[in-house]
Amino acid sequence: MSGSTESKKQPRRRFIGRKSGNSNNDKLTTVAENGNEIIHKQKSRIALGRSVNHVPEDILNDKELNEAIKLLPSNYNFEIHKTVWNIRKYNAKRIALQMPEGLLIYSLIISDILEQFCGVETLVMGDVSYGACCIDDFTARALDCDFIVHYAHSCLVPIDVTKIKVLYVFVTINIQEDHIIKTLQKNFPKGSRIATFGTIQFNPAVHSVRDKLLNDEEHMLYIIPPQIKPLSRGEVLGCTSERLDKEQYDAMVFIGDGRFHLESAMIHNPEIPAFKYDPYNRKFTREGYDQKQLVEVRAEAIEVARKGKVFGLILGALGRQGNLNTVKNLEKNLIAAGKTVVKIILSEVFPQKLAMFDQIDVFVQVACPRLSIDWGYAFNKPLLTPYEASVLLKKDVMFSEKYYPMDYYEAKGYGRGETPKHAIE
């Protein structure tokens, strides 16, 4: 790339440049306004390929490597070629492999492949991994690993923040898109506007289905993958989903198994009908969530917490679940409100564990908001989320049956140590 900036609009320059007519190609002559010439060495040209991150052909065409990859399920993309290339590129020596429990069955095969084709030592991290917030680069570094591969979750924690090199492997899954398309066409009138999303494994399928249905003249459907940044378009997390305009959508459709991630969107958008397509059993179901009960239970927890004097402020230590900035902000606001604060670090939050802190009146956990939403009733003391604690302190708006924010890891969310747009101060 040339060092010239002539094509950009700039203020009048002090020097007027021209190439020297009789010099070699690595010189550049500039003439000052007083007539003196200044000779500069020209910046060397660097040929930058269009695909800087393209996996080399010798890795893609390695017959032995490709044979080893066949030991893994063909519809699961573990991105072995990309992993091998990154390990070699960074000259890594000790690799940590972190994946959810459902994929641990494949961990030893992947471990053997990487050891054989990269000449490295691998370490399988067997602790629970609920989501991308659980990436445990701290433990990996403590175990002398210089590289961690995190499977099946998106890049929630940026790679420039982690303490060692990280490669996120989404483990995208190939599914029968034609069946999804026929199912949606059978259940929704032509021209329906459907917010469609899923976990990161099915994100390619969401976008592929969108394109195919948009181009189907006989029964076109507007499939709209919503986005709450910094998540990918069409991606949803159990704690983070986009707030949708009920006037703009006829329905929401979640592609994936289970309800955990879908519930985030239903809690955030209770007035939009929700459906789920399970790609494993190929069932399409109408889903519901008892928003009234949610509001009653969480409002009661806040009311009980108002009487509390001693607050236990929990920093989640499961991977990177906790956020120290959010803890500091809550501590400051609680102290300003006349509360006594006891800070606690926990990797996992259980009712039996918190019951041991008998002198604490209220707990506020900076770990996962779904702990409070789903299991708060099981604790003998109120267990508030950062958002609910902010409502208690009159720093955020109160929720209702029509609105409960699920934007924890949004760019300005509490999960990132920021102040969300719905906050009062």
From Swiss-Prot:
Pathway noted in the entry: Protein modification; peptidyl-diphthamide biosynthesis
Phenotype for C368 to A/S: Resistance to diphtheria toxin. Abolishes [4Fe-4S] cluster binding and catalytic activity
GO cellular component: 2-(3-amino-3-carboxypropyl)histidine synthase complex; cytoplasm
Reactions it catalyzes: L-histidyl-[translation elongation factor 2] + S-adenosyl-L-methionine = 2-[(3S)-amino-3-carboxypropyl]-L-histidyl-[translation elongation factor 2] + S-methyl-5'-thioadenosine + H(+)
Sequence segments annotated as region (Required for function but dispensable for interaction with DPH2 and DPH3): 1-60, 366-425
Keywords: Cytoplasm, Iron, Iron-sulfur, Metal-binding, Phosphoprotein, S-adenosyl-L-methionine, Transferase
Residue ranges, compositional bias (Polar residues): 20-29
Region annotation Disordered: where it falls in the sequence: 1-29
Names of the cofactor(s): [4Fe-4S] cluster
Recorded superkingdom: Eukaryota
Additional free-text comment from the UniProt record: Present with 2526 molecules/cell in log phase SD medium.
Recorded family membership: Belongs to the DPH1/DPH2 family. DPH1 subfamily.
Protein name per Swiss-Prot or TrEMBL: 2-(3-amino-3-carboxypropyl)histidine synthase subunit 1
Taxonomic source organism: Saccharomyces cerevisiae (strain ATCC 204508 / S288c)
Lineage of producing organism: Eukaryota, Fungi, Dikarya, Ascomycota, Saccharomycotina
